[in-house]
Amino acid sequence: MKNIKYEIGDIVFVSKYEYDNGNEGQNHLFVIISDDDQLVPIEYFGMIISSHIEKEKYSTNVRINKNANNNLHKDSIVKCDYIYNIPVKNIQFKIGRVDIDDYLKFIEIYNEFLDDLSKKITA
């Protein structure tokens, strides 16, 4: 098992993950938004990054521009409507970090999404 501890805001390459519908996904970038609060985490939680910038039009997608800090190859979006469980064994490496302001924006959008969803359920 890897002894690398990733931090909130790290952008990591994940070899295998599970979509919310149960289907398996492979080889994608994620922003780490939390861990399991263990001294040596066995899983992390993250939001998926997509290079399909045309999807920026959706309210839960947030654009991040490539820069020397995040090391993205192109401008991308973070999909802020779902948090993925990422086992540490599936994280291959870190490529960069997002700015704290971007991270806070992701969390704000996610919380707004949950509030809207809650209102629809109780309506």
Give each language-model segment a name.
Residues 67-123:
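C-terminal terminal-subdomain/extension
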Residues 13, 32-34, 82:
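A residue-level detector for short acidic-glycine micro-motifs
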Residues 21-27, 32-67:
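Compact nucleic-acid interaction/catalytic patches
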